[in-house]
Amino acid sequence: MKLNFAKRMSYIKASEIREILKVTEQEDVISFAGGLPAPELFPIDEINEINQIVLKEAGTKALQYTTTEGYAPLREWIANRMNGRLGTAFDKDNILITHGSQQGLDLSGKVFLDEGDVVLCESPTYLAAISAFKAYGCSFIEIPTDEEGMMMDVLEDVLSNTLHIKLIYAIPTFQNPTG
């Protein structure tokens, strides 16, 4: 039986991140390439305490399926925290819980990118973002960076002279992979 995959599957290549993470599974390897936090720094006691509080307060509701946007009390808490810290006016309907950056990047590509669109990105940039966006048939133009981020003169030139730019992907804090 021949499977008839979607055309966009031809854009998807093996993940560089997946290959890097395979190496990190070896016991004698300390990898600085995979973006993995040091396991000894995980706040196990704090997470256990929070789990106990959530289960005591929410019971089985905390373990049940919920809407695709995520657990409503958590979304409400995040909105209130953002409003208090940033002076914004979010409510829970402005918050979407993802299962990590990859799901967020994939959803962004799905919502914003069409085949043939151009994405501007920092050089270097997060490899997994390129993989996520590439699945939607876009191409990339790299913008060189300095200690302050994208070089604005190059960015302005590219914006003035390039068609079909749909998205600028930038990491404004703790840039990956440069830190």
What are these regions (language model features)?
Residues 2-66, 80:
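N-terminal "arm"/small-domain region of PLP-dependent enzymes with the aminotransferase-like
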